[in-house]
């Protein structure tokens, strides 16, 4: 992530807080106004606020279904054009709700907010974040509502960051603006030792390290996207995982934590999105592995374990 920002915006007398809300948090009118009240209360407490929002509920899946009704082989570029629409709906509705509550807000698409990416359609990576527009809106004492998950590449084409990309968008903004806090709101109250929706008697963790969270995310824990944790670790952005439905203390994700109880195991995760590929008759000669993994990389396939 190349900042290239010049002077970073920061009002000395106000904290800057980045808040991210997932699709379930804005899935209908009641949830949208619930989020709007959380954001408005944060702003009214004397903070500058940037909000990053995902597409509503199952919108992304619904858009994928609509594409499949047209063609079974859509181009990645056109899929990004389609999928980016989900977040644009969310940011507009949330900005309307905030304005309805008397909290002045401006919605920005990913490209309006300054996200620049590479050309890997549907799985793009952020290359630069130009924050001038966000900063100018904050200077006007407005809440800035940003569409997560999306950006613009060098061809001026819309790109998306892949599943969980809104988490990455939020962390990138927090890093670029040197935010005081980066809060990730979900439908659970923090990071648990296992998924509380599937396992009984789980325990919520008050703190967890970036490395531990990254391991859980890589193994299938759906609280945070693993790319967002990688970015948070790189720029040392502390994350706070909270519930948008229950105002209780959540889990802080940071570089170092005090392990008072000496827990041997912090958490258990299950990953069902895994495929096993067996390659037979591989020649034992230099360069073979490079060719194989090069082909996988071209298709944006991550290799987790080699046996």
Regions found by a protein language model. Give the residues of each.
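Terminal amphipathic helices with adjacent charged low-complexity linkers/tails
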Residues: 53-60, 241-257
């Amino acid at each position: 992530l190349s900042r290239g920002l010049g002077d970073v915006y920061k009002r000395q007398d106000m904290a800057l807080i980045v808040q991210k809300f997932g699709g379930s948090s804005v899935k209908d009118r009641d949830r949208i106004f619930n989020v709007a009240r959380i954001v408005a209360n944060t702003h009214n407490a004397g903070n500058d606020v940037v909000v990053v929002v995902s597409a509503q509920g199952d919108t992304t899946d619904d858009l994928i279904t609509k594409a499949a009704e047209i063609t079974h082989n859509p181009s990645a570029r056109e899929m990004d054009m389609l999928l980016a629409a989900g977040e644009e709906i969310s940011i507009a509705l949330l900005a309307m709700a905030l304005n309805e509550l008397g909290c002045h807000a401006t919605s920005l698409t990913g490209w309006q907010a300054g996200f620049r990416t590479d050309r890997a359609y549907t799985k793009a990576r952020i290359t630069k974040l130009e924050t001038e527009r966000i900063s100018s809106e904050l200077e006007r004492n407005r809440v800035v509502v940003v569409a997560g998950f999306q950006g613009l590449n060098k061809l001026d084409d819309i790109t998306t960051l892949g599943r969980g990309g809104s988490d990455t968008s939020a962390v990138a903004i927090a890093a670029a603006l040197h935010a005081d806090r980066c809060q990730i709101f979900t439908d659970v109250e923090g990071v648990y030792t296992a998924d509380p929706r599937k396992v009984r008697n789980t325990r919520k963790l008050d703190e967890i390290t970036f490395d531990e969270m990254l391991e859980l995310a890589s193994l299938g824990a759906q609280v945070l996207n693993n790319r967002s944790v990688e970015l948070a670790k790189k720029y040392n952005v502390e994350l706070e995982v909270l519930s948008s439905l229950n105002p209780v203390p959540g889990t802080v994700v940071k570089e170092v934590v005090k392990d008072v109880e000496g827990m041997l195991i912090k958490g258990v995760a299950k990953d069902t999105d895994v495929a096993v590929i067996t390659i037979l008759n591989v020649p034992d000669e230099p360069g073979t592995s490079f060719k194989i993994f090069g082909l996988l990389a071209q298709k944006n396939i991550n290799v987790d374990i080699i046996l």
